[in-house]
Amino acid sequence: VTESYDDFINNAQTWGNGNMWQSDFKDSPSAQWEIKEVKRKLYRAVANVNILEGIRFYVSFACSFAFGELKLMEGSAKIISLIARDENQHLAITQNILNKWKAGDDPEMKQIMKEEEEWTYAMFDRAVNEEKRWADHLFRDGSMIGLNDALLKQYVEWIANRRMKAIGLKPVYDIAAKNNPLPWTQHWISSKGLQVAPQETEVESYVVGGIKQDVKKDTFSGFKL
């Protein structure tokens, strides 16, 4: 992700510091090629963020939620669930951007997405394989109740298929869309299924500074029990 961002920033700065964007040159073949390369770097940066938010960390998320399902370290699991929901918000933003480009919001970006399809699949595959290796590392000494490395690997493939389909790519992993290997993770990621007791969370509904300030000595003179 940082490499893609660096490439885009450096490329954009080179474009901005040059003169190809000026009216005298912007319609020349060289200028058109340069601006397209800037857009290509932008696409790769956004696509990498999409993969980051949509696939990476999900092995760790699932492990944290598994402890929560066992009533162990529930506080940590609930905090991690908030992080996962935040990731989902970022994911939705990048999906919206990519789908706008794919629909022709910018015709040149639509062309770039088609040209970069092979690269995009390679980035998805790289992220999936790295998450699988992390699952192997976490469960190198054995499994836990309800979770093991094999299930996690299937889960990562299932998520990757969903992420690819969401941006108009064909899913490549052999796992049915309806067969979530870890269905119990959904209520941790979705705010609809999670209940939090008041004593376990920060309550923000208290009235602050609600004391009546104009009380005088005779205010309660007519008060009787």
Question: Where on the chain are the PLM-derived regions?
Answer:
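Non-heme di-metal
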Residues: 1-225
